[in-house]
From Swiss-Prot:
It holds the Pfam family Lactonase. Its EC number is 3.1.1.31. It catalyses: 6-phospho-D-glucono-1,5-lactone + H2O = 6-phospho-D-gluconate + H(+). It is an enzyme of class 3 (hydrolase). Coiled coil: none annotated. It comes from Salmonella typhimurium (strain LT2 / SGSC1412 / ATCC 700720). Pathway: Carbohydrate degradation; pentose phosphate pathway; D-ribulose 5-phosphate from D-glucose 6-phosphate (oxidative stage): step 2/3. This is 6-phosphogluconolactonase. The keyword Cell inner membrane does not apply. GO terms for cellular component: cytosol. GO terms for molecular function: 6-phosphogluconolactonase activity.
Amino acid sequence: MKQTVYTASPESQQIHVWSLNHEGTLTLVQVVDVPGQVQPMVVSPDKRYLYVGVRPEFRVLAYRIAPDDGALTFAAESALPGSPTHISTDHHGRFVFVGSYNAGNVSVTRLQDGLPVELVDVVEGLDGCHSANITPDNRTLWVPALKQDRICLFTLSDDGHLVAQEPAEVNTVEGAGPRHMVFHPNRQYAYCVNELNSSVDVWQLKNPHGEIECVQTLDMMPADFSDTRWAADIHITPDGRHLYACDRTASLITVFSVSEDGSVLSVEGFQPTEAQPRGFNIDNSGKYLIAAGQKSHHIAVYEITGTQGLLTEKGRYAVGQGPMWVVVNAY
């Protein structure tokens, strides 16, 4: 299995392309100059394209991924109705979802042969919209509205339109600020990191109709932490055994173990990391975690070790200015 790591640095308007080997070493393959401040990125389900959101001219760009080394070639672009904060796709590669924090909306762009061709839907009124997350069955889009302390639930129609479910939303505790999410591989649980109180909620998917319930909320900060809480990102290993979330003020990654059924999280430890970790990701083998320091202008590679999933630093690498996003592609 070959793996490529992509890092987005908006201040220098660059994407760095890295080869990741089995020992956790990165080798630089390419530096792409992007026409704008590049932030969110996602790889298409078929591994052939990288979709990125840029500003101040709000667009989604599509880059072809070379099958031999992961290098990027620009392919297409499509306009967006707001500054892109988060980008994702449905599991069949038919649509791109973009959440916009500043515009307070989520948009759906249709893909044709892997390329973005037209905007098909926009839902407004999502104050502080910070991500858009399709359920494993490709039926329901979960959209955290950070400033409203709610997660809105939409059914994805065959033509890409979003229809509010019943109930149309669930609420977090006041002041939590739901931000980013991941789903457990067993498809029965989801985990949402809350930016403003640096906690993680465990949501149970109770039935195929989209009904969900919060079954656990866990503080992700050390007991003696007294500064402003500012959580950012969350990811789970492919086997569902370990979960990680980061806080930018503390510049740390919290390590969680996940119960066998996915319903219970336990804090296993805290890993100091690059200054102001805005984004990170886990490789497809579940062996390495790559974190980006927005203030250090570096990324760090960690090996995931032992039954607790604790992190051991393998190396750090200079990237562009203000790195914010990391994605990993395997082929």
